[in-house]
């Protein structure tokens, strides 16, 4: 988790798969002695890839509990301390975790999940499936241009994004707001010039005062491979923002900007 809320989403997904409250989870992250190498945080892959692994882990742990308690798949599972109960139409079945012989690492019951999205390389005709799924989105920007000073202010952005299935609406909207903020910086102010942009006085970044009004529309077209139909929303929130802003500038002034950022001199 690098700030996008992946830890919360992983727990939510696993809790749903296992069938217990997320409050019963104790998340361990970044411990190479306990956690497997799941790859890097990039390419909108955490909810889709790691989330699917979390779902599979929860489902496998639930299957073990169901088998141990000898209850139906519809059983409700509850845990309090070392007591695990599974209740279905036949009654309530109690499992005392301390009565179970622990594994070498001290764990009593475990569920593990891995997910490697299916892909196929491009053939000689450039046909194939290099990625398991794709994100889609569209943004519209309303801008105000001062033709005397050459400055641009973004007034409003409407963003519609297909997220497959929304796991955590607040975090999804926050991710889109963050992408738009980065896109705003890309479009209007962020530029690195060697020996000039040496600090944040010379390398400008958006502040809360630069942010426009944002309207987010979440489109849910479930992705069969993703956890409960979800897919990532990382780059997809950033990519359309600058083109939308530049389109607004051209519509207002007739000037096409071909080099970012769109500073007054350009």
Residue locations for each model-derived region?
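Conserved strand-to-helix beginnings and helix N-cap segments that scaffold or border functional pockets
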Residues: 7-8
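C-terminal catalytic domains of large/alpha subunits in multi-subunit enzymes
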Residues: 12-266
